[in-house]
Amino acid sequence: MNKEDKINIDLFKVVTRAIGESYDLGIMTNHLTQLLVGALGIKACTMFALNFDTRELEILASFGLSLAYLNKGPVLADKSVRDVFKGEPIVIEDVTKTDQIQYPKQALQEGIKSMVSVPIKLYGQALGVLRLYHSEPWDVSKRDLDSLEILAENIGLAMMYTRLLNTIQSIRETINELPGDIAPLLKT
């Protein structure tokens, strides 16, 4: 694929609205992975959250990959496109010519020829990874890479927002479950 811009302002608006209008992280990430695959004409997209304890990338949402590929084994942050955690997007134009892929054999069997990994960051800390897969060599334009970085930062904000919202809802439910004479005291 040549180096042409795929992300225009209309696509960026649709994607940004999908992020801003969702209160559910699972629905939002599933919608975004499907939207990106269709709009960019790529093979697949996966969003991962970093488990800080195990250093594994846990799948938030994925579209376009087989169950066999998704279940190939744990995706370790230090072995799978590890340089993305230095804070910059990584473009792998040919998966056969890199040592950054943890499961190269499975990637080839899946029909993956190239991939782009973009850190999902909040306040400079990586929370996860937005990963896009293509079935042919992919030379991503600088403008599209910049757009994907901004998108990933918005996803980071949305992840934090939905976690905060879920925490507040959980606290509200806990307060409402308290005995009748205690709950009103906490609401004032």
Question: What are these model-predicted stretches?
Answer:
Residues M1-I27, I168-P184:
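Signal-transmission linkers at sensory-effector interfaces
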Residues T16-G20, L32-G41, A49, L108, ...:
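Short regulatory alpha-helical segment in sensory/regulatory domains of signaling proteins that mediates
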Residues Q34, T46-L70:
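GAF sensory/regulatory domain recognition
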Residues E58-L60, L67-Q102:
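Regulatory sensory and allosteric helical modules in signal-transduction proteins
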Residues E93-S114, H134:
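Signal-transducing coupling segments at domain and membrane junctions
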Residues K113-K121:
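A short, aliphatic-rich beta-strand micro-motif
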Residues V129-W138:
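Short beta-strand-to-loop transition segments that serve as allosteric relay/switch motifs
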Residues E149-L157:
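Allosteric cytosolic regulatory segments
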